[in-house]
Structures are given as structure tokens and as C-alpha cells.
A protein has these predicted regions:
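Positively charged, small/polar-rich N-terminal and surface patches that mediate targeting and assembly
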Residues: 1-104
Length: 104
């Protein structure tokens, strides 16, 4: 089992989630987050507002999937979300056991 933590630009979320829906994953969660990568301390226009790149809005998608599916999905997400511009995003893949959860 692998956990994918995908950080992308908000406008790419629909395309990435459509791709995730085509694969058998154990779970998928989506959050709106802010943060920075290597581009910190630069100003950029985003939807008519100026942002310090240290805290641009992003979408975080957390996915749990079997190893083979996760590897394939990570490559496909990278292709779909890539624009070639700074701040496209990151994909972190870690080994994970399915956590014990209390369902209610």
C-alpha cells in the first residue's frame, strides 16, 4: 500500500480527480491548502489578486492505493498536472499500511 500526497494548482484539481476516478483506490481526500516550494518570496498575479508565492493557494489530494496502482497513478498525475511553469506541484509517495479507523 502506498500513500500519495499530491499538491497542485487549484485549476488542475478537476482533471487530476477525474484521472483518480479511473483507478481503483482505497481512499481519496481533498483539501484546500496554502504553501510554498522553491519559488518562495516572489510575487505573482492569481485571479486578479497579487500573492506572495510563499503562500499561494493549492489543492492537496491524499490517495491510498495498492503499490502498482499508486506508481502508475503518480506518473499519470504528473503528466496531467504539468504545465511547465513554476509551482506546478509535487507528488510525495510513501509506503503506508491501511490505518485502523473507527467508522461511525
Amino acid at each position: 500500500m502506498k500513500q500519495l500526497l499530491v499538491i497542485i494548482k487549484p485549476f488542475q484539481a478537476t482533471a487530476v480527480l477525474d484521472l483518480v476516478a479511473q483507478h481503483e483506490v482505497e481512499a481519496c481526500f481533498v483539501d484546500e491548502v496554502k504553501g510554498y516550494g522553491r519559488q518562495k518570496n516572489n510575487l505573482e498575479q492569481y485571479r486578479g489578486s497579487e500573492y506572495n508565492l510563499a503562500f499561494l493557494p493549492k489543492v492537496e489530494i491524499t490517495i491510498w492505493a495498492e503499490d502498482e496502482i499508486a506508481e502508475k497513478l503518480a506518473k499519470e498525475i504528473a503528466q496531467v498536472a504539468h504545465t511547465g511553469l513554476m509551482g506546478d506541484g509535487k507528488i510525495f509517495m510513501t509506503d503506508a499500511a491501511w490505518p485502523e479507523a473507527m467508522e461511525f
